[in-house]
Every structure is written in C-alpha cells, then in structure tokens.
C-alpha cells in the first residue's frame, strides 16, 4: 500500500507544471487575451482523452453479491458527511476558499494587465508579460506541494490549513498594495504566498478527506470536496467578483 501523504504530492505536482507551461505558451505567443488559447486547450484535451483511454482498466472495487442504492451509485451519500460538525466546517471553508481561488484565477492576470492604461506602468516588463509574472504563483505551488509531507508531519493538518487561510489574506493584501514597478516585489511575494495558500488547503484538504472518511465513501467525499471548491465556490466567487468589478471599475 502507498503512503498517500508522501505519494500523492509528487504526482499532483505535474498538473501544476502543465498549468505553468500553458501560461507561458499563451503569453509568449501573444495569445493571453486571444480566442486561440481555447483552441490550444481543446487540442490538449483531445490528447489527454486519448491518453486516458489508453490506460489499463481499473473498475471500482465491489464485494461479491453487494448491491448499491441509487443514492450510493451517484455518490449522494457523501452529503451525509455534512451532519458531522467537523466535516461541515471543513466543506464550508472549502466553499469560501473556492470563491477566493476563483477570484485570483479569473482576475489576477487581468488586474496586472490593467496597469497598461497608466502611462507610468504601460511599458514595464510585468505588464507586457503579466501572465508570466503571475505564473510565479504556480512555480511556488510546485515547491509547496512537494513540501506538504514535511509540514503535515511537523505541524499537523489543522495548523497547515490555518496557515493557508492566513496566506490567502496576505495574497490579496500584497496584490492590493503592489504595482508593476517599485511595488513589483509585493506582487512577486503575493505570488509566492499563493503557493502556500492554495496547496496548504486544497492538497491538504484532499488528504484530510482521505484520512477522515470511511474507505467506501472516500471517492464520493472527494467529489463533494471538489464540488465545493471548483463548483459552488467557483460560482460564488465569479458572481461576487463580477458584481464588485461592475460596480467599482
């Protein structure tokens, strides 16, 4: 059996490396604000689908003679976890942090690019290559992913998640005071902090679910965790940020 805490991060880090490659490719080819990036993503998706279909079959484990209800088949039994106060608090935190994640993913690059409308910053490197600057966040993410086993063994999962929440405050605070020239260091530090903010909750959160949910419900619970962050959290974050931007910008 694999040690999930030690084995998962080195595998998960390759997703972030792909993220960085996509950001650099679209920026260096002049397509960071072009429809072409969607064509690139579509091609990459077809390649990924072909690779996925080539993988060995791995059917879900099922005991002989075992039957499942419709609720279990669709993974809806994971919602029973919300009756547990600890799990309810975790999933609500996932919802809020998912909203914050959506805000930085959707508007982080746009925010830095917006400085081009100010003559003082228009020709700065960080504005012309804003996507590359923001990709420092993902570079930081790769390093913190690999450091997760150490931090979990040193501080425990609760303290690691608390560090993540503090890091999110620093992320947005530094972005709000930074600028592309003399304040560039704040933006860069905010990108470095992002790695901690994201990994210490999202990756550690997956490990938290894995260690606190019975084996037969883990897949459904991981799906619920993903739905809270990238589903309901994404809807909440994109809706609120859209309203605020329309009102104040």
Where are the regions that the model predicts?
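Symmetry-related core transmembrane helices of the 12-TM Major Facilitator Superfamily/SLC fold
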Residues: 37-54
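Helix-to-loop junctions at the C-terminal end of transmembrane segments
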Residues: 29-30, 143-157, 245-246
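Pair of pore-lining "gating" transmembrane helices in MFS-fold secondary transporters
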Residues: 83-104, 192-193
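Intracellular juxtamembrane helix-capping segments at the cytosolic ends
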Residues: 1-2, 200-214
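Short amphipathic helix-loop junctions that connect adjacent transmembrane helices
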Residues: 106-130
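Juxtamembrane intracellular "pre-TM" segments in multi-pass secondary transporters
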Residues: 57-92, 117-122
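C-terminal ends and interior cores of transmembrane alpha-helices
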Residues: 167-181
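Loop-to-transmembrane helix entry/capping segments in MFS-fold secondary transporters
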Residues: 2-14, 127, 213-226
């Amino acid at each position: 059996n694999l040690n999930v805490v030690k084995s998962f991060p080195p595998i998960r880090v390759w997703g972030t490396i792909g993220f960085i490659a996509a950001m650099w490719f679209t920026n260096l080819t002049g397509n960071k604000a072009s429809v072409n990036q969607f064509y690139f993503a579509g091609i990459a998706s077809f390649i990924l689908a072909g690779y996925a279909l080539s993988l060995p079959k791995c059917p879900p484990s099922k005991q002989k003679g075992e039957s499942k209800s419709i609720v279990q088949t669709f993974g809806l039994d994971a919602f029973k976890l919300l009756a547990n106060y600890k799990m309810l608090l975790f999933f609500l935190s996932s919802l809020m942090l998912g909203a914050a994640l959506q805000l930085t993913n959707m508007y982080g690059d746009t925010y830095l690019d917006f400085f081009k409308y100010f003559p003082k910053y228009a020709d700065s490197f960080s504005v012309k290559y804003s996507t590359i600057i923001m990709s420092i966040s993902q570079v930081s993410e790769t390093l913190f992913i690999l450091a997760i086993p150490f931090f979990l063994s040193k501080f425990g999962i609760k303290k690691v998640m608390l560090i993540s929440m503090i890091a999110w405050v620093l992320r947005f605070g530094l972005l709000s005071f930074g600028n592309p020239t003399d304040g560039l260091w704040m933006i860069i530090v905010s990108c470095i902090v992002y790695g901690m903010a994201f990994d210490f909750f999202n990756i550690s959160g997956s490990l938290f679910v894995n260690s606190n949910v019975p084996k037969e419900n883990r897949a459904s619970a991981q799906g619920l965790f993903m739905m809270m962050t990238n589903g309901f959290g994404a809807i909440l974050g994109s809706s609120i940020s859209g309203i605020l931007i329309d009102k104040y910008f």
